[in-house]
């Protein structure tokens, strides 16, 4: 296996090294699910059932990590909730997992490796049994990979943010950190159905059709004009590579076939003209990449769930580089990640709040679903 395959990127972000995994374990909401999720309406476990984070800044135990994952996964996958709870209660399996490097013990990574290696559609007990029996195959793959989910639906809030900061027809240079395979670097190549209180707004003509529910304001009315695009990732994936596409599919929940269909459609759209993705570290490579933007374009740097996984110093370096180059910045990150965005929000609220905040140039715009399926404007 080539060296490019040996350096995978961070959980669900597709980029960077994790120095502190605590941000991954957000405080769960009281209830989770959006109605479109198979797990809609699943309630948060009673108080006391979710173990507290270590107060000394240390790493949570593997058992605690999987129990917390079960709470978060209730938003997206009932099957993976079963898997997480079963692993959390299996001392033999936890002991095996603890032999992996710390940054490779994340539930999302291990579930994805299992999917890549052909785990059947089984309940929690069946998954734990399969995992133990196949550990000799699982361990080396888990030790060399890190998840880099690439969800094209995140283009829906991206389109909304770009409309707020660009003029109609203004050409944009789009630069994404943690780009994975680059599915979010081509928002104008897809089509959209934004559903708001005043009806449905359709934009674009490409595939897949990305559906987003909008509340608290109007739906976007135009797509961006992307004249130049580049991505940054420690280990870029290629939509033309069957191996890379198989990994992208393995990163998705087994009980969300619509996400797999959407991924395949986006891959098909991009495979004849894939975005260019530069291999490298965001803090180190972003300055040169921004310097390469052709003149006359509005430069927009995008982070769709990536900054949370960068070490603090690297995150600050990225923000400083964007400011120094006079570029715009669109972020879809956990709400408390960027203090200046939180401060700018003040007392503004969204009709349908989520743990994720869409912001542009430091101005908070809306709450949004982690994978882009809802957008709730702040007011």
Cite the ranges covered by each PLM segment:
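Non-catalytic accessory regions outside enzyme or core folds
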Residues: 57-99
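A short SAM/SAH-binding and catalytic strip from SAM-dependent methyltransferases
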Residues: 299-312
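Class I SAM-dependent methyltransferase Rossmann-like catalytic core
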Residues: 95-169
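Class I (Rossmann-like) S-adenosyl-L-methionine-dependent methyltransferase catalytic domain
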Residues: 270-275, 287, 316-317, 321, ...
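Short, Lys/Arg-enriched N-terminal segments with co-localized hydrophobic residues
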Residues: 44-58
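Class I S-adenosyl-L-methionine-dependent methyltransferase module
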Residues: 100, 120, 149, 168-279, ...
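Low-acidity, Ser/Thr- and Arg-rich intrinsically disordered low-complexity segments
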Residues: 1-15, 19-31, 36-37
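Conserved SAM/SAH-binding loop
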Residues: 280-284
